[in-house]
Amino acid sequence: MFSAVKPLSKYLQFKSIRIYDSVFTIHSRCTVVILLTCSLLLSARQYFGDPIQCISEEKNIEYIQSYCWTMGTYILKLDDFGDQEQALVSPNQEVSYNSAFFSSATTNAPQSSSRVRTRPHFRSSLRRIGEYNEAYARSLSIAEGVGPEIRGQTERQYLRYYQWVIILLLFQSFVFYFPSCLWKVWEGRRLKQLCSEVGDALLSEETYNTRLRMLVKYFTTDYEDMHFCYMAKYVFCEVLNFLISVVNIIVLEVFLNGFWSKYLRALATIPFYDWDRWNRVSSSVFPKIAKCEVLKFGGSGTANVMDNLCILPLNILNEKIFVFLWAWFLLMALMSGLNLLCRLAMICSRYLREQMIRSQLRFMTKRHVKRALRDLTIGDWFLMMKVSVNVNPMLFRDLMQELCELRTSASGSTLESPV
């Protein structure tokens, strides 16, 4: 397993030229590695065995397992009644709906002296049935949502996501990787051409002077439109990151059939150590044992229903993976949203842009920084910020000093020492 995941670690290594900021890197690179690791972990049969294992009296067990894996399994729906809903249902009314199965239970069920209204077309809770029938209660002990079905009383909940988990994770990894791939194409190795060979702390004098003259010439040349498009494309990729995080939260909600709305209520039970409710909510989406119905036809064409019990070992891991991914996507959406707000503030405020450049400089006054940035557009500023994190700090300070002197000589004013 480690040998399969090890190549992904190279994707997290820092490059000599950084074309993404920290939020972009976490969003596109770290998330992709997490998703690919989860998909590899789920596909490792040596740890979890086959994705489904069924128990049956039939000899052709492999056929049954393949059928249940292909057609899907189900559990009996567990209704989560509140106190008010439970007060509306009496034992006698529940038992009367299935007299054949509850013939022995109706004589022992407690009688209610008060008149209770019932809703039409009422479908009873699986747990409520078990409270008034001992045999059915024993069957419920197999697993949550696994027991005999009662016509008109129980409802099936199909686990349609189980076969698609690995495919979903691979698709999500591609979606999260797309903005970084798009920006890498749009960036066109511009920063590498500007900042190569000058990112180290120690530079030869010849390289230092050559690169300094090249950067001064570049930022004194009018590339206003090109730099604005450069910045606009990067901001578009940041917006894409935010939208992808939000959409993936919604996708998980739909994919898991509204689990997260229930899961938030389950979190409230942790301070009270209500693990029974926690287990019920978790088992309604990630059951470890489920039912599977296989049709077997006789010689005359009569269909016989084979009720099989299936173990879903991958749900042990699916439960942890999706809980983590939901929290991770929420964190990514929050970070991307805050990053966009900061980007908007930088675009609207020249003062903030000057302060950001000044934070990269030491021993340079605010007035000199302001003069060096006087003729630079917002696109020029954006590219200069990218250059500042990829070059030697001393080289960047000398670049700003050169620009300040050029602006001063062009205006005909005198320049005081920046220190």
UniProtKB/Swiss-Prot annotation:
GO CC annotations on file: gap junction; membrane; plasma membrane
Known role: Structural component of the gap junctions.
PROSITE patterns reported for this sequence: PANNEXIN (PS51013)
Tissue expression pattern: Expressed in the cortex of the pupal CNS and at low levels in the wing imaginal disk.
Pfam families documented for this protein: Innexin (PF00876)
InterPro entries: Innexin
Organism: Drosophila melanogaster (Fruit fly)
Membrane-traversing stretches: 22-42, 163-183, 239-259, 321-341
One GO biological process term: phototransduction
Topology in membrane: Multi-pass membrane protein
Stretches assigned to the Extracellular side: 43-162, 260-320
Protein name, UniProt field: Innexin inx5
Family to which the UniProt record says this protein belongs: Belongs to the pannexin family.
Keywords of this entry: Cell junction, Cell membrane, Gap junction, Ion channel, Ion transport, Membrane, Transmembrane, Transmembrane helix, Transport
Subcellular location, record wording: Cell membrane; Cell junction, Gap junction
One function term, GO molecular function aspect: gap junction channel activity
Residue spans, topological domain Cytoplasmic: 1-21, 184-238, 342-419
